[in-house]
A protein has these predicted regions:
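Bacterial N-terminal signal peptides that target proteins for export
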Residues: 1-12
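His/Glu-rich zincin catalytic helix
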Residues: 24-93, 106-109, 119-120, 191-302, ...
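M16 family metallopeptidases and their MPP-like homologs
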Residues: 35, 40-66, 80-126, 139, ...
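N-terminal glycine-/lysine-enriched basic segments
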Residues: 146
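Alpha-helical scaffold elements lining the catalytic groove of polysaccharide deacetylases
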Residues: 182-185, 190
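Mature hydrolase/peptidase catalytic cores and their serpin-fold inhibitory cores, especially
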Residues: 421-424
Length: 498
């Protein structure tokens, strides 16, 4: 855990430099956030619409993604090419992302070009045309996106994992949908979805940077012209399984096996247990950091994979950052662990990770380890709030969760988590006996036989010896997966998301 210390010091310095970055201005509506930074040559826009894939009609998975990604493909005043050319001329950007609950439209422009930019941005939001030629192109792009997920073992494993975890629930399909549904999408489908979901009551929005009052007034006025109404989301909970289950995704000639292990949880950011779970997940395996237990046991001690991590909620990185992105708010969440060893070590890694997960429920983490992790997570706040754009994203996320103090009290909430409560929180929310395991493998039947067998292989890197780890390795090998043949399902990668 020593590698955390220097990083925490740098983070603390970053916080001191960060605090005066923006000031929060009063908006006429509680649904618009304004963060002013006079003198900054940039203006950021962010609109969050509760029109994500959870709102897809049952027979049309992927329609939310389809609709959102047509918004910037042509408006009343601009064709797709004209829009792209205009943005290029003024050095501005418009981005669209879609998750289960929300669509997020972002904009970035030089302050001196904000008038020209806003005339485009407002039309993307309020006046898309869903041109017929763009509908066909979008279908092709969306189908390519799904094929890309199948080709990428990491995204494939996560997609299968999420679909199964939330089977029968509104989260139970890829955000991008299925190939069969996409091929049937029409312009009218996109128009109706937009009409029914892009409503005032579904929208949260914000501005940051060199924001003038006149821009705020215009922005709010245009949002106020959106159709009134709000779509009430289903409150149905996902089904919770009480056994271990395995899905083997068969894909030829795999050098590694992508592993996902976890289960649905009954908390999200609105639950007081979120912060203890955030610490436990960081202790177990902070994303792309080397200090976590999984990283240490899988990579550092045994050299079985390049990384191993754990997440207390759905995780999507912010670009190339190690940090979680904004705009992936979810009512329903899940805990999961991941790694990617060579196939021969897949079973051993499953046992090792479940063993570490189990220890959190049976053994108290040392005070020193938690102190270091607590400092790391609390000080990470500096990078979560590093720019006006990131701050705007954090503020809108807390507004969506209806938690007005989440951002301001983030560090305090992390720092006040009692060490004595962590094991009981783990007992409440971590269930190693109830996990779903997804593995991308070359031969499903051979892997199934291995998982059901008595022996557990361990192939260390060339020249490495078990040494002092032999006794611990033997204990891990003896970990009982308690699997029956009916608990293991084999599927073909090429058949996923059809």
């Amino acid at each position: 855990m020593k590698s955390i210390t220097k990083y925490c010091g740098c983070l603390a310095l970053s916080i001191a430099l960060l605090l005066p970055l923006v000031s929060c201005a009063q908006s006429k509506t509680e649904r618009v956030v304004v963060l002013k930074k006079p003198g900054l040559p940039v203006v950021y826009f962010r609109v969050m619409i509760s029109a994500g894939s959870a709102m897809d009609p049952t027979a049309k998975p992927g329609l939310a993604y389809f609709t959102a990604n047509l918004l910037n493909k042509g408006t009343t005043s601009y064709t797709r090419d004209q829009l792209e050319d205009k943005l290029s001329q003024i050095g501005a950007q418009i981005g669209i992302s879609v998750d289960k609950e929300v669509v997020v439209i972002t904009g970035k422009t030089l302050a001196e070009k904000v008038g020209e930019f806003y005339s485009i941005f407002r039309e993307v939001l309020t006046a898309p045309t869903f041109a017929e030629d763009q509908v066909k192109k979008m279908q092709s792009e969306q189908l390519d996106r799904i094929n890309g997920i199948r080709e990428d073992d990491s995204r494939l494993a996560l997609g299968v994992f999420e679909n199964k975890l939330f089977e029968g629930h509104r989260y139970g399909h890829l955000v991008e949908g299925t190939e069969e549904a996409i091929k049937r999408f029409t312009r009218d489908d996109a128009y109706r979805f937009y009409r029914d979901n892009y409503l005032q009551g579904n929208i949260l929005a914000g501005l940051a940077g060199a924001v003038e009052d006149t821009l705020v007034e215009r922005f709010e006025a245009d949002l106020g012209k959106m159709p009134s109404g709000q779509v009430v989301r289903s409150a149905a909970e996902p089904k919770v399984e009480k056994t271990r289950r395995v899905i083997l995704v068969e894909k030829e000639n795999r050098a590694q096996t992508q592993l996902r292990i976890g289960h649905v949880v009954d908390y999200n950011r609105t639950n007081p247990d979120y912060f203890p779970m955030r610490l436990l997940a960081a202790y177990l395996g902070e994303n792309r950091e080397a200090f976590g237990r999984l990283y240490q046991t899988v990579r550092e001690q045994r050299g079985l994979a390049y990384g191993a991590y754990a997440y207390c909620e759905h995780f999507r990185p912010a670009g190339w950052s190690k940090l979680i992105d904004n705009g992936i708010v979810r009512n329903g969440q899940y805990f999961h662990m991941m790694t990617y060893p060579k196939e021969a070590n897949g079973k051993f890694c499953i046992k090792l990770m479940l063993s570490e997960m189990t220890k959190l429920t049976t053994t108290q983490v040392s005070q020193d380890d938690i102190d270091r992790v607590q400092a790391y997570v609390a000080n990470q706040y500096a990078f979560l709030m590093e720019t006006p754009d990131k701050q705007l994203g954090m503020r809108l996320d807390e507004l969506w969760y209806k938690m007005p103090t989440f951002v301001d009290k983030y560090q305090e909430s992390i720092n006040k988590v009692p060490h004595s409560e962590l094991q009981s929180v783990a007992l409440d929310h971590l269930h190693p006996d109830h996990v779903l395991i997804v593995a991308v493998v070359s031969n499903g039947e051979a892997t199934k036989k291995e998982l059901l067998g008595i022996d557990t292989k361990l192939e260390l890197p060339s020249g490495a010896q078990e040494g002092a780890l032999k006794e611990i390795n033997d204990q891990i090998k003896a970990f009982d997966l308690d699997l029956k043949p009916e608990d293991i399902v084999i599927v073909k990668a090429r058949e996923m998301f059809k």
